[in-house]
């Protein structure tokens, strides 16, 4: 299930690195990196935490694209 995300883009807008983002939402830098690369899909709870820190909606960051 491909989950597209704009986490890196939004994170850069608030000038926060992966380590800082991880600390803000309670995960490791590696988890943030995996999410940005598309190697890991966050839980609903984590997606909501990320959206809250970035002050955007979950839909602004993450989008689902059906495989054709």
Segments the model singles out, each with a brief description of its role:
Residues 19, 30, 59:
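Residues within helix-turn-helix
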Residues 45-60:
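DNA major-groove recognition helix of helix-turn-helix/homeodomain DNA-binding modules
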């Amino acid at each position: 299930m491909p989950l597209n995300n704009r986490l890196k883009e939004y994170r850069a807008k608030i000038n926060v690195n992966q380590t800082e983002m991880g600390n803000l939402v309670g995960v490791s830098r590696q988890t943030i990196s995996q999410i940005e690369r598309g190697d890991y899909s966050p839980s609903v709870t984590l997606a909501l935490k990320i959206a809250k820190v970035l002050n955007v909606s979950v839909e602004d960051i993450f989008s689902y694209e059906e495989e054709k």
